[in-house]
A protein has these predicted regions:
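"…together with the soluble PPM/PP2C metallo-phosphatase catalytic core" -> "…together
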Residues: 7, 172
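Gly/Ser/Thr-rich active-site cleft segment
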Residues: 52-171
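Short beta-strand scaffold segments in enzyme catalytic cores
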Residues: 15-18, 175-179
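Alpha-helix C-terminal capping segments
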Residues: 179-185
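Acyl-thioester C-C bond-transforming condensing/cleaving domain
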Residues: 90, 186-188
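Short, small-residue-biased leader/transition segments that mark boundaries at the very start
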Residues: 1-6
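Residue-level marker for buried hydrophobic side chains located in beta-strands
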Residues: 31, 166-169, 188-189
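Glycine/Thr-rich phosphate-binding loops that ligate phosphate moieties of nucleotide
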Residues: 9-47, 79
């Protein structure tokens, strides 16, 4: 038989995990389905600022996005917001647990509402609005980025060789579109 030598990864978009300085979760993950940020989204949606954020990030102003979840957190749970050292998604956190690196891919980052899809970097104007810094977010790489070198204990627990490569992969939405062939300059479904 052949051995697995590479793993790909994917996750649901729009989730938010709040980490402390030691990168330990401060609460349960806030999933895409959590609508507690509806008021924040509604306040921002039709403003000049909201339209600019949409132009820059390509992400509609909606309660499911981490953009509005963070604003909701500031307004409803300011003490928890102050304790939060890092704002990450589920896949970002899993890669941290596996390899000790906070990293994300462009597709997953694009669903946050604070990633500039034109410059392929975190959107500083949106981060200013949220009162967060780039250092509180994962480093962002193309979906083809590979990480190799599982710690021996982790590799043994997972039954994987420690020299296996993990491909950063993407998020469910962008990968679904890719699988359907819905990409390119002139393709619309």
């Amino acid at each position: 038989g052949s051995e697995m030598c590479i793993r790909d990864s994917s996750s649901a978009m729009h989730g938010l995990i709040l980490l402390d300085e030691e990168k330990t979760p401060l609460s349960r993950m806030i999933t895409w389905a959590d609508n507690r940020a509806a008021d924040e989204a509604e306040k921002l949606k039709y403003t000049v600022l909201g339209k600019e954020f949409y132009r820059q990030t390509g992400t509609p102003i909606h309660p499911m996005t981490p953009l509005n979840k963070i604003k909701w957190l500031q307004n409803s749970q300011p003490e928890l917001f102050k304790k939060t050292a890092y704002f990450v998604g589920i896949k970002d956190y899993i890669f941290y647990r596996l390899f000790g690196e906070l990293i994300s891919d462009y597709g997953t980052a694009s669903g946050t509402g604070y990633f500039d899809i034109h410059e392929f970097q975190w959107a500083e104007e949106v981060l200013d609005y949220l009162n967060i810094r780039i250092e509180q977010l994962p480093q962002v790489f193309p979906s083809t980025y590979q990480v190799t070198g599982l710690p021996s204990k982790t590799a043994a627990e997972l039954g994987l060789p420690n020299d296996i490569s993990f491909v950063l992969g993407g998020a469910d939405g962008p990968l679904s579109n890719l699988g359907l062939g819905a990409f390119g300059d002139t393709c619309l479904l």
